[in-house]
Amino acid sequence: MTGYSTNMRIKLPLFCLILQFITIILFAVFVRYDHESDARGWHDELKNHSTANADNDFYFRYPSFQDVHVMIFIGFGFLMTFLKRYGFSSVAFNFLIAAFGLQWSTLIQGFFHGFHDGKIHVGIESMINADFCTGAVLISFGAVLGKTSPVQLIVMTLIEVTLFGINEYIILNIVGAKDAGGSMTIHTFGAYFGLIVSRVLYRADLDKSRQREGSVYHSDLFAMIGTIYLWMFWPSFNSAVTAHGDDQHRTVLNTYYSLAACTLATFGFSALLNGEGKLDMVHIQNAALAGGVAVGTSGEMMLTPFGAMIAGTLAGIVSVLGYKYLTPVLDSKLKIQDTCGVHNLHGMPGILGAVIGAIVALFATADIYGDGMDDVFPMIFDGSRTAKQQSLYQFLALLVALGFAIVGGTVVGFILKLPLFGTPSDAECFEDAVYWEVPGGEGHQQLTVVVNNEDPDTQA
């Protein structure tokens, strides 16, 4: 039964190759270079002396893109390697999701934001936005880590990316909310989407795999690599698509100080909540990053450096409390099995970030922003909204993100329950040997242990 149900020999090639073929066809029909990457278009502008090579958006955006790309493939990937028997899958399934997600999101977001004359025009900013979209899916992946097959993850990516594009378009273009760092569109949406999927896929007998859900010394060390990369590059993540100049500069500053304050709060509360005053590596790996999430919406606003520190401190406290007290309740009472604790790192800090953004928007005045209001709050600048109205629309955007996450996660969860995606059994969760050739004789030994429902750590 195990060999048949989880065998990827037909399922995985079928889904990967068919979806890649469809994507290539769609790119051939719709996708073209934008004017800054098209040879003829760009050189025509140079010939007309209307621009210079140094003005190409590539030189302004590519450093941020590099940082975001590292976060997606190394940061998120290694952050999930804390599971002692799931390191291959954590990094590699992250790789798989991101590789497909960035292609599909280029199409979906292109239809909403870059569709001109019947074509999708791509450039450096569309690459950044595609990575952002992929980030939301990777957050959802964290909630179901170890309990899903690679085929299930591809299907989830296909649908979630599509819903992300619709949700983002409604929030940014119809509601008119500001969310450059994605507190709502990326973190809140991705976290609660994943949590709802996890709830629908609830495993009553997951205790059969609980012995592998924990970490060991070296797996926690690998996860800290992901933490450090994410922590270092989060200012680039929040500022990557903000306006050039003071907006981007201010976003980096706010994120920088929020993360620093969050880290101190995390260390402090981690020790405080332990009876022996010891630190918990789960808190340090995750909660120390919540400060970046908490200023995703307000980072480009005039939050002030001390305001950013307050936001980061609150995020760190909320996240640690969530890991300590709320995660067990979600599991035992609400039947939400959140492997990575995305509710504590992305969900609650994402909501906090949305609320902070709405509060800061409420106090936006011409005296504070001057002509810079046009970049941050263009509708307030042109008089079509008051600051109070903008604040209310920020709250509305949060509700939209939550609505899409809950409804979309429910639908996707039931789709993933279909018995054709090679999902692992309750006794096979959190185990690489189910889907991977593990080096040496270890893989066969561990798979035998899994089938017999034994604790691998007790085997000679």
Swiss-Prot record:
It is a multi-pass membrane protein. One of its GO terms (cellular component) is basolateral plasma membrane. Gene3D superfamilies: Ammonium transporter AmtB like domains (1.10.3430.10). Pfam families: Ammonium_transp (PF00909). Glycans are attached at residue 48. InterPro entries: Ammonium/urea_transptr, NH4_transpt_AmtB-like_dom, RhesusRHD. Residues 32-62, 109-125, 172-179, 242-252, 305, 369-394 are extracellular. Residues 1-10, 84-87, 147-150, 203-220, 274-283, 327-347, 416-460 are cytoplasmic. Keywords: Ammonia transport, Cell membrane, Cytoplasmic vesicle, Glycoprotein, Membrane, Transmembrane, Transmembrane helix, Transport. It is found in: Basolateral cell membrane; Cytoplasmic vesicle membrane. GO terms for biological process: ammonium homeostasis; ammonium transmembrane transport. The chain crosses the membrane at residues 11-31, 63-83, 88-108, 126-146, 151-171, 180-202, 221-241, 253-273, 284-304, 306-326, 348-368, 395-415. GO terms for molecular function: ammonium channel activity. PANTHER family: AMMONIUM TRANSPORTER (PTHR11730), AMMONIUM TRANSPORTER RH TYPE B (PTHR11730:SF42). Functions as a specific ammonium transporter. Belongs to the ammonium transporter (TC 2.A.49) family. Rh subfamily. This is Ammonium transporter Rh type B-A.
